[in-house]
Amino acid sequence: MDIIRQLEAEQAAKIEAKRKLPEFQPGDTVRVQVRVTEGTRTRVQAYEGVVIARAGSGFQENFTVRKISYGEGVERVFPVFSPMVEGVEIVRRGKVRRAKLYYLRDRRGKSARISENTGVRARKLNDEERDALNAEKARIEAEKVAAAQALAAETAAKEAAEKKAAAEAEAAKAAEATPAE
């Protein structure tokens, strides 16, 4: 394996460790969580639309999402392994027979709609993703609770140490005052 592919594989593994994208394909309506930096502030912005294409492979893979914003079609290309993509949530599965849905650019209204895939495979994928999402939320919540408990224990230990130090200082002060009398 040459150096470039090795570096790409390392970067892909690093990003995969942070977040795992669900399995989606053209025709699916997705909500992409994108990290946006405005000045010094960074926030996560949702971009919801229909996946009209997936291109590339490996580390260079990307997908195009199209949405209609104020009557104007807007398309955005997201690299799959971009650190700016926080996550992808599948809103609904589309039933299409093409890999590239560029024909949607010329369509408006009802003709631009994509029927929902209600097949067994789509239901299975949706259930798996829902279970994975719930497990991830439970894990994050458990981490928050553990962090809160650790912080409470640390605060209690700090307060106990402060009380002990104050009691020792008071005892030393009392010991100093007693021999003088």
Curated annotation (Swiss-Prot):
Pfam families reported for this sequence: Ribosomal_L19
SUPFAM superfamilies on file: Translation proteins SH3-like domain
GO-annotated cellular components: cytosolic large ribosomal subunit
UniProt biased composition (Basic and acidic residues): 162-173
Official protein name in the record: Large ribosomal subunit protein bL19
Region (Disordered): 162-181
Keywords: Ribonucleoprotein, Ribosomal protein
Secretion signal, residue range per the UniProt entry: none
PROSITE patterns assigned: RIBOSOMAL_L19
